[in-house]
Amino acid sequence: MACSIGNAFRCSSDTLRFAPRQQCSSRLNPNPSSFLSFNSSPILAQNLGASSSSLSRRTIRARTKMAASEASINGSNRMLVFVPPHPLIKHWISVLRNEQTPCPVFRNAIAELGRLLMYEASREWLPTVVGEIMSPMGPASVEFIDPREPIAVVPILRAGLALAEHASSVLPANKIYHLGVSRDEKTLLPSVYLNKLPDEFPKNSRVFLVDPVLATGGTIMAAMDLLKERGLSVQQIKVICAIAAPPALSKLNEKFPGLHVYAGIIDPEVNEKGYIIPGLGDAGDRSFGTETHWVK
């Protein structure tokens, strides 16, 4: 499903609905995914395989591969929000929402959700090298992630650590750069207290920016600005979040057209305290057991 979105959102527990206007198109897709386009026309990815050339034996020759679908989407000037319709994603979101979920279970759930979202976000985005090697039984065509192309994960502390916990098991040879951004609970403005980003990211880097909750948008906007200042284009960044809300998505769309956001779910609103409703509470406190009380 692909949808073009107007200026306002309204979501239900069963189906994402958007107001005031909505245009949807559906097509047969081997890897179905729901994604929402902040533009007037819908866009839907297709798996269009790339043809392979003959390979010499016992060698691995570098050839960057990217499916035509991903290339065409990246070439567009639209911000897309992907909500993968995977039953495990729905399961872990449900575990996270439950106020009775204890801290260890919550942290495991958010880590498993992060693994699934990174898997979906890396689909057809990571460059590969193809070639032929010898298996114990004879020659075999192979395809590996290209080790020359830098892959980085940037978790926003604290809760981003939990969501990115399984990044290394999904993404080969990735680097992790920590970024600490806190939010003033009165003004809701972000403040950077830890910055372990490089002065400049290597050329052709692909970066996964991980923040569990996109509510008012202050934290993710500050993080995006820091990445852009260090030489990254919007096409080199993918945002991973457990849950998102319209205020944050609208701000990202306005300033960073072309950005791709992968979310477990989109909720309809943010309250006056800056929390998503119904949301999942404070992801950092619930991940690390530091929540002493909760005022709804």
Curated annotation (Swiss-Prot):
What are the record keywords, sorted? Answer: Acetylation, Allosteric enzyme, Chloroplast, Glycosyltransferase, GTP-binding, Nucleotide-binding, Plastid, Transferase, Transit peptide
Q: Domains: what does the record tell us?
A: The N-terminal sequence (1-125) is sufficient to address heterologous proteins to chloroplasts.
What does its activity-regulation comment describe? Answer: Allosterically activated by GTP.
Q: What biological process terms from GO does the record include?
A: cellular response to phosphate starvation; developmental process; UMP salvage; uracil salvage
Q: Where, by residue number, does uracil bind?
A: G281, D282, A283
* Gene name, Swiss-Prot/TrEMBL: UPP
The entry's function note states: Uracil phosphoribosyltransferase (UPRT) that catalyzes the conversion of uracil and 5-phospho-alpha-D-ribose 1-diphosphate (PRPP) to UMP and diphosphate. Is probably the only functional UPRT, since the dual-domain proteins of the UKL family seem to lack this activity.
Cross-referenced Gene3D superfamilies, in alphabetical order?
3.40.50.2020
Q: What happens when the gene is disrupted?
A: Growth retardation, pale-green to albino phenotype and flimsy roots with less branching. Loss of uracil phosphoribosyltransferase activity.
- Coiled-coil residues are none
Entry's EC annotation: 2.4.2.9
Which cofactors are required for activity?
Mg(2+)
What catalytic activity does the UniProt entry give for this protein? UMP + diphosphate = 5-phospho-alpha-D-ribose 1-diphosphate + uracil
Give the subcellular location: Plastid, Chloroplast
Q: State if Disulfide bond is listed as a keyword.
A: no
Instruction: Give the residue range annotated as the organelle targeting sequence.
Output: 1-61
The family database entries (SUPFAM superfamilies) matched by this protein are listed as: PRTase-like (SSF53271)
Name this protein carries in UniProt: Uracil phosphoribosyltransferase, chloroplastic
Q: What is its main location?
A: plastid
List residues binding 5-phospho-alpha-D-ribose 1-diphosphate. R158, R183, D211, T216, G217, G218, T219, D282
Pathway noted in the entry: Pyrimidine metabolism; UMP biosynthesis via salvage pathway; UMP from uracil: step 1/1
Q: Which Pfam families match?
A: UPRTase (PF14681)
The record's comment on protein family reads: Belongs to the UPRTase family.
